[in-house]
């Protein structure tokens, strides 16, 4: 059904190209996963270009759980342990311990503070001592095989920000409705139009990557 509802935004390849262009302009995008999986839409930003205003929008319209998608090499460099040794969650989402910038923040909760934490963690010269643990930002370690190995928002975010020419770190948060329920495709499409954000699916991105190989 998602593909039918999204047809007004172009075909799968066109949707990916539009999303890449939007990211390159510093905009956020929305990525939908499979209806038989989480059936959710995530706001997605490049960690390099995200602004305080975009973080505020993310917190306001999202679940509040702002996640930073990182690679395994970045996780090791920052010495971030996985949140649990044995992951029994449905989709094996790779949560590490939560983080906070050790400098430049107050309580760590505000949009400005959370963005400061993300910028600190994704800096090229970031060290473990630059971050306190726990905190209010949730790092997610991506599957090393990328989106072709795990069709999750974590891998999709890293894939598309990389395609846009940025470092492989994306910021994501699930969209929710005013009543606190999870936004589904019709609500997500309405939101994307109201905020003029490009929208695509993980399936679109997988097809795009496969076609490039």
From Swiss-Prot:
Keywords: Lyase, Magnesium, Manganese, Metal-binding, Riboflavin biosynthesis
Pfam families in UniProt: DHBP_synthase
Biological process, per Gene Ontology: riboflavin biosynthetic process
Pathway involvement of the protein, from the record: Cofactor biosynthesis; riboflavin biosynthesis; 2-hydroxy-3-oxobutyl phosphate from D-ribulose 5-phosphate: step 1/1
Cofactor note: Binds 2 divalent metal cations per subunit. Magnesium or manganese.
Amino-acid positions noted as binding D-ribulose 5-phosphate in the UniProt annotation, renumbered to this chain: 37-38, 42, 150-154, 174
Catalysed reactions, semicolon-separated: D-ribulose 5-phosphate = (2S)-2-hydroxy-3-oxobutyl phosphate + formate + H(+)
Physiological role: Catalyzes the conversion of D-ribulose 5-phosphate to formate and 3,4-dihydroxy-2-butanone 4-phosphate.
Protein name (database record): 3,4-dihydroxy-2-butanone 4-phosphate synthase
Organism whose genome encodes this protein: Buchnera aphidicola subsp. Schizaphis graminum (strain Sg)
Upper classification of the organism: Bacteria, Pseudomonadati, Pseudomonadota, Gammaproteobacteria, Enterobacterales
Name of the gene: ribB
